[in-house]
């Protein structure tokens, strides 16, 4: 149970692919102009990670070490092609919006990295959980960045959600403030870099505060009964 918890915590927070490893920055910065685009690519990446980790882990005993990387790439490319066709069939608007970044998941360092570092060494169930956790960690980072950029740039949230979730999702669109022209700095790549930098700083501050609290709690437990840390 502790190993399962550790895999989840590592994927979502401690070893977050976007905020700690800084992998997959090209789609992270390019696609997150809206919350819908960010969520769509994040979920597609999560599905690819989960399925490829599961497949590679299942076949790990029959995969020759000398040619494992080409085999991994073939498996990843097959899964990405299937996911791309699903998005094309059921979310064509999102497919057009994401464009080349869907097939580029094949070359995403996150996917290949987890295949080599985790799936090739662990069992199928734990590998699938690792892929799902890593994918959801990246999705959360993309969604937060996309939401911030969309709110600051257009004053809206979930604009175009119907492209991802269907026509009913039009009701999810929220206009936070009205603007006649978008704030281009937030919508263009410089805004993505600034937003990512602020998110990295925020995660660092949260980690430092949590580390300080753990140190204080450990110090209090180490004191004899009835004593305090104050002089």
UniProtKB/Swiss-Prot annotation:
It is found in: Cell inner membrane. GO terms for biological process: electron transport chain. Its EC number is 7.-.-.-. The chain crosses the membrane at residues 18-38, 39-59, 63-83, 86-106, 125-145, 182-202. Part of a membrane-bound complex that couples electron transfer with translocation of ions across the membrane. Required to maintain the reduced state of SoxR. The complex is composed of six subunits: RsxA, RsxB, RsxC, RsxD, RsxE and RsxG. Belongs to the NqrDE/RnfAE family. This is Ion-translocating oxidoreductase complex subunit E. It comes from Escherichia coli (strain SE11). The gene is rsxE.
